[in-house]
């Protein structure tokens, strides 16, 4: 359950805004995902992912 679930959460995270951060620092984000993703629930987001989301939100508001 843990191994299969980890793969599923990584794929789901890749589809969201974290996907852009993964391309930049794939190794760091994957390690953080394994430590901070429990059952698909984010306990804490990496600062890089938070910055990416903030940038995207600001862009949407301008549009």
UniProtKB/Swiss-Prot annotation:
Q: In which tissues is it expressed?
A: High expression in placenta, skeletal muscle, kidney and pancreas tissues. Absent or very faint expression in heart, brain, lung and liver. Expressed during adipogenic differentiation of mesenchymal stem cells (at protein level).
Query: Which ranges are annotated Low complexity under compositional bias?
Result: 1-12
Query: Which residue ranges are recorded for the region named Disordered?
Result: 1-41
Q: Which InterPro entries match?
A: OCC1
The similarity annotation says: Belongs to the OCC1 family.
State the name under which the record lists this protein. Overexpressed in colon carcinoma 1 protein
Q: Which organism is it from?
A: Homo sapiens
